[in-house]
Amino acid sequence: MSGSAEHLKDEGSKTQSMIAGATAGLIARFVIAPLDVVKIRLQLQSHSASDPLSHRDLRGSLIYKGTLPTIKRIFREEGLSALWKGNVPAELMYVSYSAIQFTTYRSVTLALQDTVGEHRMPAAAESFIAGASAGAVATTATYPLDLLRTRFAAQGVERIYTSLRASIRDIAVNEGPRGFFQGLGAGVGQIIPYMGIFFATYETLRVPLGTLHMPFGSGDATAGVLASVIAKTGIFPFDLIRKRLQVQGPTRERYVHKNIPVYNGVFRTMRHIIQNEGYRGLYRGLTVSLFKAAPASAVTMWTYERVLRLLLKWEKAQESPT
């Protein structure tokens, strides 16, 4: 695959793209789950770990300092399984998200090609539009699962939600349908530029990197890592705002950070964070996010390419006369 001049978006049927995308999301999610829990807890921490003055209103909130210390503390106080809190809704989200994302990406790309005909737009622009559209559709469709993942990961020793079914019932009763979509504006505002930049960068880098003789065909993985790091850094403040909006509601003061402020709206939340935490507050958890994004994207893209290739080979073998 790496040495092929074909683009990912031109290969396979819709069903094959969906299967490959779902498989890639499932595997990637399990691998990076502990880093995801750490990232969420750092993002929700509105007090500075290094500024004692910000500790005056902790209300029993925990203080996390860095990736490894946070992992150790979670393991020590909550057990090994705590590093996979929220993994059930997260697995469902990643499988669904990846399948919808790749399928929509391919469909939009083919639609653009049919629309413009001979006057085909540049590959980078095509990838940006298709990636942004795929991200927006997938984010909206799977957002309730994303919110549940965040709330489960934010739980400490005290269990607010005992199961996935109980959490859905509790939110529906106490917050209504809108409760499942808190922070959606930040989610879509984040994912559209992220996926556009990611796919445009990935498609640009994949072919030239694929011509290099790299071990285990890792040109795809390298392109995925670079594309992810570039895109993730640019839109990280929206990711943090989304997380803080997701834990708003009647359970806001019961998570590991019991002093989470009341937020309302994307830009008002951004303004509140800048005023009270400075611009650095918008980038809490960025380091672990990049550590997480790199292996997650590498595993996702590498697995997607390989699974799709296996499906194409299997289809060809089925069509070949025996």
From Swiss-Prot:
UniProt entry tagged with the keyword Disulfide bond? no
For the keyword 4Fe-4S, the answer is no
- Location of the protein in the cell: Mitochondrion inner membrane
Q: How does it sit in the membrane?
A: Multi-pass membrane protein
What residue intervals traverse the membrane? 18-38, 92-108, 128-148, 180-200, 221-241, 285-302
Q: Which GO terms describe its biological process?
A: thiamine pyrophosphate transmembrane transport
What GO MF annotations does this protein's record show? thiamine transmembrane transporter activity
Give a GO cellular-component term. Answer: mitochondrial inner membrane
Main subcellular localisation: mitochondrion
Q: What does this protein do?
A: Mitochondrial transporter that mediates uptake of thiamine pyrophosphate (ThPP) into mitochondria.
> Where is the organism placed in the taxonomic lineage, from the top?
Eukaryota, Fungi, Dikarya, Ascomycota, Pezizomycotina
> Keywords, A to Z?
Membrane, Mitochondrion, Mitochondrion inner membrane, Repeat, Transmembrane, Transmembrane helix, Transport
The record's Solcar repeats, renumbered to this chain, cover 12-111, 122-208, 215-310
Its source organism is Sclerotinia sclerotiorum (strain ATCC 18683 / 1980 / Ss-1) (White mold)
Q: Which domain of life is it from?
A: Eukaryota
Cross-referenced PROSITE patterns, in alphabetical order? SOLCAR
Protein family: Belongs to the mitochondrial carrier (TC 2.A.29) family.
Any Pfam family the entry gives: Mito_carr
Query: Which SUPFAM superfamilies does UniProt cross-reference here?
Result: Mitochondrial carrier
Q: What InterPro entries is this protein classified in?
A: Mit_carrier (IPR002067), Mitochondrial_Carrier (IPR050567), Mitochondrial_sb/sol_carrier (IPR018108), Mt_carrier_dom_sf (IPR023395)
Q: What is this protein called?
A: Mitochondrial thiamine pyrophosphate carrier 1
